[in-house]
Amino acid sequence: MQSPPDPANSSMHSQDPHPPRRQGRMNSKDITPVLKGWDYEPGTINVRKITGTDGRPKLQMRLDLGLLQMEMSGRPDGTTPHGCESLLDYYEARLDEHRRINGTDLGFHLTPEQCQSLREEAVMYYHRYISLFVLEEYSGVVRDTARNLRLLDLCSQFAEEEHDRLVLEQYRPYLIMMNVRARASIAYKNKQYAKALEAIQEG
């Protein structure tokens, strides 16, 4: 991770002899109008659903210095790494191919760099599933928590370094809890009370 700039190495001029000219289109990138009327509330998960310029629904999470915007499905940042829905899908496909060719998992490994990229991707899905939980869109919570649990399984089994095999395990109980709460909430909303209780007991 790149270190933040040192303020001591910065310079500020009280009078710039050649001040930059303002350009109209620069103002269009200012997110102040987007944040107006939507104050950040410390200790609260502030989220909302909006319609993007592409006509599709998107999630926004308010932060102290701005916001996060996420796609409702697929990878939250809207990218398709290596042509796949996510990095997890890409490495799972590589594992399947390795098994097909070799008939075994032996020899398949994830490097520290690959594990780091997977962890960064997992954070994106974390932001989305807690946003969806606040909005009571529980099916998306089930989907994303189950997906991150698959990621934990992949890293714990195939990471080259012990650190990468263990570092995410601290989050497994929380992921399971959120998955159970979401499944139980779906059943409860559908008045399937026995199924809601069953989901809790299974968790």
PLM regions and their residue ranges:
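Cationic, low-complexity basic patches in intrinsically disordered or flexible, solvent-exposed regions
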Residues: S3
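Acidic, Ala/Val/Gly-enriched low-complexity intrinsically disordered segments
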Residues: D6-A8, D16
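N-terminal alpha-helical interaction modules that lie
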Residues: P20-C155, Q201-E202
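Acidic, Ser/Thr-rich low-complexity linear motifs
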Residues: G107-P112, Q157-Y174
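Alpha-helical protein-protein interaction scaffolds
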Residues: R181-A187
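Structured, non-catalytic alpha/beta "coupling" segments that mediate domain-domain communication
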Residues: Q192-G203
